[in-house]
Regions:
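Ser/Thr-glycine-rich phosphate-binding loops at phosphate-binding pockets of nucleotides
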Residues: 144, 148-149
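Cys-dependent protein tyrosine phosphatase-like superfamily
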Residues: 1-139, 152-245
């Protein structure tokens, strides 16, 4: 099945879970976010295969990998080898045993805050890359397309004035789209994907609500935060145009 005719959010791919377009949300000035500009998803597993043609239809021209250095070494992104794609890798959270131990002892939203406070330089690089991206869609991904990807998606939607409830709803959709993979992994004996044993696999609305509240109360707004870490007003305006115009 190919990408939508231009006005559907979910993108069905053979080798990628949790893939969707950020288009279709009401935003500032009575406008709506545009389809085919920003795609969020998890990492592709295996070779690109038929997904290559589907992504070319959109067309995806820029990919930003948000995973940790260890993750990308163990499982390199298939997008990095695509000749027609500009590939960037900027770590927002390093997933390792120390991180897992830390995140298990605190609410998930607090680990999201670490991406703002402990990875400022990389966060700035993500938005520099988005602003400078050539014409075509920007696809950004982590491992599951839920946490680090969810952070960037929330910030993009916030930049153009999408309502908080819609931002939270966009985050929650991962619960549904990841279920088939989680069930398969648990059936194969991988209990790490059991949501009852690992509640951080869930995309609870409270997690994104608290993250957005922290961002606004601490920095004033997403735009103010990004400006504070070195993303220029001109770059932010360019990003807004990409998503709205």
């Amino acid at each position: 099945m190919s990408h939508n005719s231009g006005n559907a959010r979910r993108i069905l791919l053979d080798g990628v879970f949790n893939c969707r377009d950020l288009g279709g949300y009401p935003c500032a000035g009575g406008k709506t976010t545009k389809f085919g500009r920003f795609i969020r998803c998890g990492i592709p597993f295996g070779p690109m295969g038929p997904d290559r043609a589907r992504l070319a239809e959109i067309p995806v021209k820029t990919v930003i990998d948000l995973r940790g250095n260890g993750e990308s070494k163990v499982a390199p992104s298939a997008y990095a080898k695509e000749p027609d794609i500009v590939y960037h890798h900027y770590t927002l959270l390093e997933i390792n045993p120390a991180y897992v131990e830390k995140v298990e002892s605190q609410p998930l939203w607090e680990s999201y805050v670490c991406s703002l406070t402990e990875h400022k330089e990389n966060m700035a690089q993500v938005f520099h890359a988005i602003a400078a991206a050539p014409e075509g869609a920007v696809l950004f991904h982590c491992a599951l397309g839920k946490d680090r990807t969810g952070i960037v998606a929330a910030m993009l939607l916030s930049l153009v004035g999408v309502d908080r409830l819609d931002i939270i709803a966009d985050y929650q959709i991962s619960n549904t789209y990841l279920q088939p993979m989680f069930r398969t992994m648990v059936e194969d004996g991988n209990d790490i994907f059991d949501e009852e044993k690992n509640p951080h696999l869930k995309s609870d609305p409270e997690t994104m609500e608290k993250f957005c509240t922290y961002l606004d109360e601490t920095y004033g707004s997403t735009r103010a935060y990004l400006e504070s870490i070195g993303v220029t007003s001109e770059e932010l305006d360019a990003i807004v145009r990409k998503l709205m115009d």
